[in-house]
């Protein structure tokens, strides 16, 4: 069985070491790189093609915060992102996860959940991914949600004119901050298989 390829991103050398020891000691995981900042993480994600990216949310003074780096990685690669954070405020973490199109998150205070979360995310989804997806879709009207599901290839009856549907497609992409339908399908295949 192929190991889960993991890229870790954290600006704290002590936490980097902890990630190296924890993930690196797992027989079903391969730590492909550890990066101290978002810019390097984006490059490493393209170079190493990880399955999972562990992204620290608070990358201090590194030029790109964790949520933005995670979003860039999600938009440009097939990697799934797990947000790591010392911030125990759930709303902050959900907001960042939504912005980053993350698959899940782990509070650093609950570090023992990291390995199971990596495995669950690599296998398909976590309970958090459903929460994040629901939060992402919250901004859409019911008509836009129907159009959203049709864009994903779901069999949905759309009761509008072609022009209205085209306008709703544009609205869905704008609200989700996505450039096109292909990117929407790429991002949401993580949440909906």
Please report, for each region that a protein language model flagged, where it lies by residue:
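C-terminal output helix
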Residues: 89-93, 109-119, 130-131
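Short amphipathic alpha-helix used as the core "switch/output" element in two-component signaling
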Residues: 43, 64-77, 95
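Active-site beta3 strand of CheY-like receiver
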Residues: 48-59
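Alpha4 helix (beta4-alpha4-beta5 surface) of REC/receiver domains from two-component response regulators
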Residues: 68, 88-105
């Amino acid at each position: 069985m192929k190991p889960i390829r993991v890229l870790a991103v954290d600006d704290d050398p002590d936490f980097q070491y902890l990630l190296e020891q924890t993930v690196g000691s797992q027989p079903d995981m391969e730590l492909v790189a550890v990066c101290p900042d978002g810019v390097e993480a984006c490059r490493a994600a393209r170079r190493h093609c990880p399955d999972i990216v562990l992204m620290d949310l608070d990358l201090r003074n590194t030029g790109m915060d964790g949520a933005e780096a995670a979003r860039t990685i999600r938009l440009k690669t097939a990697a799934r992102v797990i947000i790591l954070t010392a911030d125990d405020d759930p709303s902050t973490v959900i907001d960042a996860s939504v912005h980053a199109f993350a698959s899940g998150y782990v509070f650093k205070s609950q570090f023992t959940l990291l390995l199971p979360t990596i495995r669950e995310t690599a296998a398909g989804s976590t309970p958090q991914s459903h929460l994040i997806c629901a939060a992402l879709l919250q901004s859409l009207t019911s008509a836009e949600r129907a159009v959203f599901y049709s864009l994903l290839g779901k069999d949905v009856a759309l009761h509008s004119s072609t022009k209205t549907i085209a306008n709703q497609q544009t609205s869905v992409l704008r609200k989700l901050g996505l450039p096109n339908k292909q990117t929407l399908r790429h991002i949401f295949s993580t949440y909906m298989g």
